[in-house]
Amino acid sequence: MKVLIFALLFSLAKAQEGCGIISRKPQPKMEKVSSSRRGVYYNDDIFRSDVLHLTQDYFLPFDSNLTQYFSLNIDSNKYTYFDNPILDFGDGVYFAATEKSNVIRGWIFGSSFDNTTQSAIIVNNSTHIIIRVCNFNLCKEPMYTVSKGTQQSSWVYQSAFNCTYDRVEKSFQLDTAPKTGNFKDLREYVFKNRDGFLSVYQTYTAVNLPRGFPAGFSVLRPILKLPFGINITSYRVVMTMFSQFNSNFLPESAAYYVGNLKYTTFMLSFNENGTITDAVDCSQNPLAELKCTIKNFNVSKGIYQTSNFRVTPTQEVVRFPNITNRCPFDKVFNASRFPNVYAWERTKISDCVADYTVLYNSTSFSTFKCYGVSPSKLIDLCFTSVYADTFLIRSSEVRQVAPGETGVIADYNYKLPDDFTGCVIAWNTAQQDQGQYYYRSYRKEKLKPFERDLSSDENGVYTLSTYDFYPSIPVEYQATRVVVLSFELLNAPATVCGPKLSTQLVKNQCVNFNFNGLRGTGVLTTSSKRFQSFQQFGRDTSDFTDSVRDPQTLEILDISPCSFGGVSVITPGTNASSEVAVLYQDVNCTDVPTSIHADQLTPAWRVYSTGVNVFQTQAGCLIGAEHVNASYECDIPIGAGICASYHTASVLRSTGQKSIVAYTMSLGAENSIAYANNSIAIPTNFSISVTTEVMPVSIAKTSVDCTMYICGDSLECSNLLLQYGSFCTQLNRALTGIAIEQDKNTQEVFAQVKQMYKTPAIKDFGGFNFSQILPDPSKPTKRSFIEDLLFNKVTLADAGFMKQYGECLGDISARDLICAQKFNGLTVLPPLLTDEMIAAYTAALVSGTATAGWTFGAGSALQIPFAMQMAYRFNGIGVTQNVLYENQKQIANQFNKAISQIQESLTTTSTALGKLQDVVNDNAQALNTLVKQLSSNFGAISSVLNDILSRLDKVEAEVQIDRLITGRLQSLQTYVTQQLIRAAEIRASANLAATKMSECVLGQSKRVDFCGKGYHLMSFPQAAPHGVVFLHVTYVPSQERNFTTAPAICHEGKAYFPREGVFVSNGTSWFITQRNFYSPQIITTDNTFVAGNCDVVIGIINNTVYDPLQPELDSFKEELDKYFKNHTSPDVDLGDISGINASVVNIQKEIDRLNEVAKNLNESLIDLQELGKYEQYIKWPWYVWLGFIAGLIAIVMVTILLCCMTSCCSCLKGACSCGSCCKFDEDDSEPVLKGVKLHYT
């Protein structure tokens, strides 16, 4: 059976003059393959460097279905295909071919593919590239043939004429010999036909494929832009057949894959050389849309707003009156005679169905112009009435039958109003209407619209003139019949409607509706309104239609918008997974399957509208996340108390389920300070943590050179810009205000940094310095100089037993042995002996030795204290040395570890701040060069203003320039608005930074997690570019313990509340403890207070939820009127207004590293065995004191003796009378100057 089938599929091409014939050609299999990420191309000629660029154009969507076609010859010519059907061109084509024998030779582009229309041929004839646009007589099976490896025939077309484009590229030699083995070549092309140009893009990749289409990413470059100027709706491929003879040609193996381009948004990544290195199809899936929204290939964990959507209508409601009669247009248009123009006649048409398509599609009319309505829309409209006015005029006068025209016909015969709604239809009747017809050539006053004057004279003057119509006169003077159809808009029930069938009325669903020509989308519900009999529609205060009368049932219906809301994407971060969940905000899950436009999105999106993982929340419909009926600590807050988390293995999810789970948010999670019934967890141990917090306090200052940004060097544009008044001045004034605000923010924040001074201890009184006598008040344990003079001081290292020894010993040296201490199981004494101790122990030793002989050894017992105290002191020395050694080793090891961690911490902090500085500086540079950047979103750039002026007259040129100015002013206004918003955010951040500077740096905050994570110890500020960095040192709980707690304790009818802390119970008793650390204390009146009784009063806090304020809108028509009066370019597409790559600071990795370093630092805390410092003061012996006192007495006696021997005792105020040693002789004074004598007093 297979052999027979293969035989039927055998293809054979025989020679024919000019063309070849293929017999028994099988139908293409048209299998589908995925395009992967191929087909990206440079859609413009602009150089971009190191930037992410969003662009809207016709692209091949990623993972599109490509249709596969073959040139195939397998199994000894029994299995052959030669697929070259005519394919749809659409909005553009992606074409890829895998081959090895140069089978694909080119393409034919056109519409009808016959000689009635032009077609374009781009082919490779093995020596040249031929490009031609002609009327071709194309072959039914266009192909090339190769015989024995040499090009033989060109069976593409038989003849050509009316050629408008002919181009032959330089010669080359194509290898036409058939090859065996795998496919070696992958050639990709993109074809776009825009504005008369066929653009061709191409890339080549070497492959080694036995079959199929290779996955991957490819970028195509432009190679041709051909000015064909023809209509291209279809195309087909020109391929090659091969033979070892001169006939019976057969195909060789090749495959090509085609797909159509679609208008979509791509994000292209350019490197510093301007090369596209990566791309994202923004409509491929929610994650791709998110990447385009935030303009980043890497997305951090969180929930992001991406776009908006409106629920798609599921049905169409068409409601027209029940009218079946046909409108009598034939009687109007086929009348035997038309009246004179000054006596024009009117026919009212009503209660009928009007098929305007018969008129619109007629080829006999020379004029068919409509005003206020589109001819193609008439079939969908209804009117209260239609009036047909008929008359006869010259062909050249038809132009006067239009709104706002003047002339003899428009002024004195038939006048249309300026707001005319209707159509003017005219056709030549030179053969039918002959003879004399009349028109009014003069009238004292011009006619009003639709005014008719049948008089033939005015004040005795004959005002009518004659038309002499004959077929032989020039065309402009020949008879022309005119029918003016005036449409009366609905102010009463419709009586004239298009031939459209009505459908059933659908309520409470999102539908497309058409009521008597009023088209729209919304939800129809029964209304409580009451219309007057002549009223058909209702409008709200903003002039929007909000109600309608059903023309069949006459029921009043309210029209409300279909569900509309935002779309948010929940992602665990691209570094963790590509899984996402989608939240349709404020939408019921029943509406979600209809909210996605399936024709605009790929199947990857539609998967989120089906399946079991659909979760209705108060925030909207969450799809793509598994709902877990439990409460956990919130990871990604979604809203309305719902959170999401990503888990690879957890109790939150079972094997095989989605990685994203949704659950109800709890106040806390396991292993955290959480609340469960009346239990509370209180920390019992802590660890040190360092948190880095970067807070911006200013942004880069910018100003805009308005004239240069908008007009460049164009003088005409600058003059036109003056008409916009002080816009630019106000803009820069706003930017100046922002700059002043930044200076103010910086000043206020860093003004908080003050030098902290300590008050010195008071050491003098009344000018006398007692610091050497009195103890230092800041060091109450320190002795004064006098005390140090009067006592010998010995300082020893204390391993932990000397202090207790000193307290035991006191001033009694005899207690030395009794006060021995225990340390690590050993009895120890300090390695210190006073003279008294030495004398005592020496006396005991000598006595014991001397009496040992005659006390039969009993006296040797006196040697025991001496030996014991020596042994104990050796123990003390040993343990002290061991502790010192171990501590020294720990200090060395841990200090080295701490130093390395601190060094790494500083390096990490430096890297983070450097990254912050780079981003801020780059952004500032981008903002400061705003005046040099020219947006391309408004259709014209300032560099071509002179070209606009040269191609257009002054008025048209000013219109085009005005469009440019309007668009750019919108761009600048939006930019300044963004800056104002950012300035407000920075202001709030600066205020918070100032608060943290006061509370965290200059004080110790009691607020948990306000100054870092945990309980605050200290903070250090550091200036950063446009901000400040805080290094918060905190201690965080490392161990916790659950206690039963109560807000108050009721005792004897009174409620006792803790003054500070909380009441806790250990199971048997109640205590009071600090909230942030477990330190139980007995409950007393000092740490509690009594307030009220034991009754519990429950209060409800106001929980009113306010709806968003909706501004009162003016009339929509008035808004449009004001807009069109003040702006000549209402259709402004802002697009990517700023062109600024606003980089986002990402120092999370560095901060995580800092946290890890802080943890390591905390682990490196040195747990040394405490070595105290023991000081012992030893009193002098009695003979020292005796000598000291004798020396003082001797000094006093010698002083008195000297005074008496020198007769100076009188100076002691009469204490002795040894002479007048203090008396002075006045006569010994000699005058220095004559008449002057010095006196000493």
Curated annotation (Swiss-Prot):
Region named Heptad repeat 1: 888-938
Record-linked InterPro entries: bCoV_S1_N, BETA_CORONA_SPIKE, S2_sf_CoV, Spike_N_sf, Spike_S1_N_SARS-CoV-like, Spike_S1_RBD_bCoV, Spike_S1_RBD_sf_bCoV, Spike_S2_CoV
Stretch forming the signal peptide: 1-13
Xref: PROSITE patterns: BCOV_S1_CTD (PS51921), BCOV_S1_NTD (PS51922), COV_S2_HR1 (PS51923), COV_S2_HR2 (PS51924)
Name of the protein in question: Spike glycoprotein
Listed SUPFAM superfamilies: Coronavirus S2 glycoprotein, SARS receptor-binding domain-like
Residue numbers spanned by region Fusion peptide 2: 803-823
Native source organism of the sequence: Bat coronavirus 279/2005 (BtCoV)
Residues passing through the membrane, by range: 1182-1202
Family indicated by similarity: Belongs to the betacoronaviruses spike protein family.
Extracellular side: 14-1181
Site feature Cleavage, where: 653-654, 783-784
Alphabetically ordered keywords of this record: Coiled coil, Disulfide bond, Fusion of virus membrane with host endosomal membrane, Fusion of virus membrane with host membrane, Glycoprotein, Host cell membrane, Host membrane, Host-virus interaction, Lipoprotein, Membrane, Palmitate, Signal, Transmembrane, Transmembrane helix, Viral attachment to host cell, Viral envelope protein, Viral penetration into host cytoplasm, Virion, Virulence, Virus entry into host cell
SS bond list: 19-139, 134-163, 282-292, 327-352, 370-423, 382-497, 808-819
Side Cytoplasmic, residues: 1203-1241
GO biological process, alphabetically ordered: endocytosis involved in viral entry into host cell; fusion of virus membrane with host endosome membrane; fusion of virus membrane with host plasma membrane; receptor-mediated virion attachment to host cell
Residue ranges of the motif KxHxx: 1237-1241
Organism ancestry: Viruses, Riboviria, Orthornavirae, Pisuviricota, Pisoniviricetes
Region feature Fusion peptide 1, mapped onto this chain: 784-805
